[in-house]
Structure formats: structure tokens, C-alpha cells
């Protein structure tokens, strides 16, 4: 049981490069990435981590990926959602699943499946909470929060001059701040992942492409977190 690392976020980068590196179809690489996400859920459960936030699809993907690639991703997401619905391990371990982001951009059938998953695995005490970022952008999250806040100020539900950070966080998709954020694929940036919540998160950048990550790599990241002296601005 891991006693200090409670909340983990992952940016699983490198699926397409994995396809190029191994001379396989992009679909096979994405499928390997989805399977790796299932392993990550098990690793977190085995380590006593309470929350895993996983950025599955960025908002930028909708404008920068081809229609064919997006269709492929949606197909694989649907298949993955069905695997989660059928997973006895998720039920036995009382996993909670939540999707966040601009879900209205997704195909209706896929959105319905995500809603079924959320209904199957509602919030509960004791198990792992899995947050899946779909059509997510940190800038969009802040903009969405600001728009909702402005509406509440306009209707006098909120007083602007007495607004606190805690009250603002109610307008975000997620309030919890990750203790540790892992990004794979050897890119040393967050690319807009939870900009408000990661202010004091420890950051671990792995050169491994996401499908290549092993439990030993995961444990290396946890050990890195254990070695840090968190200051929280002090």
C-alpha cells in the first residue's frame, strides 16, 4: 500500500511514434495504448493510489487529426468502453469512472456508451477514481469555468469581490490536484493538462512511448515522487 501518493495524472504520449518505430498499423498502436491504460489502472490499484486522471484525447485532436484517424479512435474508444462495462475487476475493486471534457463533440453513440460506463461505475468510497479526459483542453476548461462564473456573477449568485480559489474550483471539470503527473514520449511539457490543478504537482517525464511503459517504469515514477521534498510555495 502506497501511503503518500494519492492522486496521479498521466499524459500517455507516443502511440503513433510507436507504430512507426515498430512498423505496425496505427490501429495496432492505439490498441496497445488502450491496453496499457488498463494496466495502469491495475498498477494504481496495487499501489493504493486513490485517483487516476488520464488524458485520452485532446481537444486539439479534433482539428489536427484526419477524419479517418478520428473515426478509428472513436471505434477503439467504443470497444474499450465495452471492455470496461464487462470488466469484473472494475466491479470487484469498486472503481469509479468519470469522463470530462467537451463530450458534446463526440459521436452520439460513443457518448451514450460513456454515460453507461459512468452509470455502471458511480462514485463510491474505497476504490480507485478514474477520470478520463476526452476532447479536453486546459485552456478550454478555464474558459468554460470563467463563462459559468460570469453568468453566476451576472445573476448575483456569486459576489465577484469575495470570490475565493476554492469557490472558483467548483467551476472546473475536476477540483482535485494531482500529486504526480507522468508524461511519456519524451516531451517535457504539459500541453495544457490541468493548468490550474497542476501548479504544485511533481512532474515526471519518461522517454518511453506509452505502449512501451512497464510496471517497472511506473514504479520508477513513484520512487521519484517519494524522493521529492514538496514545498507548496514555501
Language-model regions: role of each:
Residues 1-234:
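Flexible, compositionally biased loop and terminal segments
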Amino acid at each position: 500500500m502506497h501511503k503518500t501518493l494519492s492522486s496521479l495524472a498521466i499524459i500517455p504520449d507516443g502511440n503513433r511514434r510507436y507504430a512507426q518505430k515498430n512498423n505496425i498499423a496505427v490501429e495496432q498502436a492505439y490498441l496497445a495504448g488502450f491496453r496499457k491504460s488498463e494496466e495502469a489502472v491495475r498498477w494504481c490499484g496495487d499501489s493504493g493510489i486513490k485517483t487516476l486522471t488520464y488524458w485520452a484525447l485532446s481537444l486539439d485532436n479534433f482539428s489536427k487529426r484526419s477524419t479517418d484517424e478520428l473515426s478509428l479512435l472513436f471505434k477503439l474508444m467504443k470497444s474499450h468502453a465495452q471492455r470496461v462495462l464487462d470488466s469484473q475487476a472494475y466491479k470487484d475493486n469498486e472503481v469509479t469512472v468519470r469522463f470530462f471534457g467537451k463530450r458534446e463533440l463526440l459521436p452520439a453513440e460513443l457518448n451514450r456508451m460513456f454515460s453507461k460506463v459512468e452509470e455502471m461505475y458511480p462514485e463510491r468510497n474505497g476504490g480507485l477514481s478514474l477520470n478520463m479526459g476526452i476532447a479536453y483542453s486546459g485552456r478550454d476548461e478555464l474558459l468554460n469555468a470563467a463563462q459559468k462564473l460570469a453568468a453566476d456573477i451576472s445573476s448575483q449568485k456569486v459576489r465577484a469581490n469575495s470570490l475565493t480559489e476554492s469557490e472558483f474550483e467548483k467551476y472546473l471539470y475536476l477540483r482535485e490536484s494531482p500529486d504526480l503527473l507522468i508524461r511519456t514520449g519524451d516531451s517535457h511539457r504539459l500541453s495544457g493538462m490541468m493548468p490550474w490543478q497542476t501548479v504544485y504537482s511533481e512532474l515526471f517525464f519518461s522517454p518511453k512511448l506509452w505502449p512501451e511503459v512497464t510496471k517497472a517504469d511506473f514504479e520508477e515514477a513513484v520512487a521519484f515522487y517519494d524522493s521529492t521534498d514538496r514545498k507548496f510555495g514555501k
